[in-house]
Amino acid sequence: FPAVHYTMGGIWVDYNLMTTIPGLYAIGEANFSDHGANRLGASALMQGLADGYFVLPYTIGDYLSHKIQAPKVKTDTKAFDQAEKEVKEKIAKLLSIGGKQSVDDIHKKLGHIMWENVGMARTKESLEKAITEIQALRKEFWKDVKVVGKENDFNVELEKALRLADFLELGELMARDALNREESCG
């Protein structure tokens, strides 16, 4: 992390990022930490990344493991069968495309679109451009991605391709959400 710049408050949290309300956690810009309460843009972002990646998986999991006494989820339902069928079809489709572009190459293109058009300095025009470019990139992905390996092997490329398919949806949603938000919150 960069050095502390200054703080402007934020929600008080304990070492595990839990507020004074049991089970309610505050991370990133929201909490009262060195980089919380929306300090320098990159610093606040890094606080959220660090909290989400290093701290929360352990603290929330530990908290919930003592609180949740849920019965085992049934898998013999129509909804489960439908979800499983859709995932299997998606996997089969990805493995059958046989395109020329690697998952990483398409992922880099998405990152470039997001960086140039959906970052902190964005305009209506840049957001509209991002939406158009992401839609085109999604078509390109489903037409020309190359996913090597097999379905039932430990297949990192398949895992990355499945995530990238989700990232393409998420990127467009982020751009659309930003486009629809006309007021400033910070």
Language model features: what each stretch is:
Residues 6, 12-26, 30-185:
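Glycine- and aromatic-enriched mobile tails/lids
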Residues 1-5:
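Short loop/turn motifs at secondary-structure junctions and domain boundaries
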